Amino acid sequence: MDEKLSRVDPKLLDLLVCPLSKGRLSYDREHNELVSEKARLAYPIRDGIPIMLMSEARRLDD
């Protein structure tokens, strides 16, 4: 994966929230996803763009 596309600007993380829980997101570099611990969802990042659709999110296993 392109190193430039596998990073998320910390300022972006300050602005984005989970569309379901409205909670903060964290970046999972291994899976290239934005994670909402509160909603237990992971939103994919494709071509450097976060896909903030619940229909595209992956449920986190316990």
UniProtKB/Swiss-Prot annotation:
Domain of life: Bacteria
Organism of origin: Rhizobium johnstonii (strain DSM 114642 / LMG 32736 / 3841)
Cited Gene3D superfamilies: 2.20.25.10
Family to which the UniProt record says this protein belongs: Belongs to the UPF0434 family.
Pfam family for this entry, one: Trm112p
Protein name listed in UniProt: UPF0434 protein RL4569
GO cellular component: cytosol
Alphabetical list of InterPro entries matching this protein: Trm112-like (IPR005651)
Membrane-spanning intervals of the chain: none
